[in-house]
Amino acid sequence: MDNRGIGYIDSGLGGLTVVREALKQLPNESVYFVGDEARMPYGPRPTVEIQKFTLQMADFLVKKHNIKALVVACNTATAQALPQLRAYLEIPVIGVISAGALAGINATRNLHVNVIGTQSTVESKAYYDQLIALNSDLVIEQKALPEFVQLVESDMAGTPKGKQIVYQAIHNWMEEKNDGKKSDTLVLGCTHFPILKKEIQAAVDKNVAVVDPASEEILQTAEIMRKNNAFHDSKNINHHEKDVFYTTGNIGRFSKFTREWLNKSNLTIKELHIDQKGLKE
């Protein structure tokens, strides 16, 4: 058994979609989350910057909380920095893209999968490579939608304007045919996008499977915990009093969203500051 917590990192609020899934599947595991809102979006940034920022978040959680595993709850960071994280850290590091690809494969019935994500994730072809590795017969189409990240971070999810932007961005694209068939599966290749899932589902055909990789990523995390005999001691059930949620951005807005999204009012939320050496409280 291992009573240390699990770390989660993202460029902003999106990683909380993965945390919410973790609270369902791994209810006894402590959560330490960093959302780097001050430097989001990561999508248009150079790879070297994404790697630097991602390593800074990981370094903070390891040194501050001695985490036993790191869940990269960010597709862009997974696409651009996963090998560097695994080389740097001596703990398991779980990325989201392999999970999303597997979930997409499991969902499709006609082998036509569409993926939406940030500019960086799409250009990296990380999803394409993972999907093709799983099934070379797939038809795969990708679209970069950085505006969806801004919708979430600007608190426009669920608003009429937000619904309009989502519909206009994906409806016609999802209706297009390739090899005579429309895609029956849409993978949400950015952890911000599940916050817009209702709007996305409303913009596509009712038979399209809208896939959130979070569930599969946490399943993979749980499997690693099982193999390493690293679950929290079940005799001392964790009620999350020690959980901490950090942001480098606006703590008021971050606090409001985090409490609402996780449906928890009594959370420890702290602000992180950025300096030349990395992140500090």
From Swiss-Prot:
Q: What is its EC number?
A: 5.1.1.3
What UniProt keywords are attached to this protein's entry?
Cell shape, Cell wall biogenesis/degradation, Isomerase, Peptidoglycan synthesis
Q: Quote the record's binding site residues for substrate.
A: 10-11, 42-43, 75-76, 191-192
Q: Which residues form the signal peptide?
A: none
GO terms for MF = glutamate racemase activity
Entry-linked Gene3D superfamilies: 3.40.50.1860
Which reactions fall under this protein's catalytic activity? L-glutamate = D-glutamate
Coiled-coil residues are none
* Enzyme active site: 74, 190
This protein's pathway reads: Cell wall biogenesis; peptidoglycan biosynthesis
| Gene Ontology biological process terms in this record | cell wall organization; peptidoglycan biosynthetic process; regulation of cell shape
Stated role: Provides the (R)-glutamate required for cell wall biosynthesis.
**Name this polypeptide is given:** Glutamate racemase
Q: Which organism is it from?
A: Oenococcus oeni (strain ATCC BAA-331 / PSU-1)
Taxonomic lineage from the root: Bacteria, Bacillati, Bacillota, Bacilli, Lactobacillales
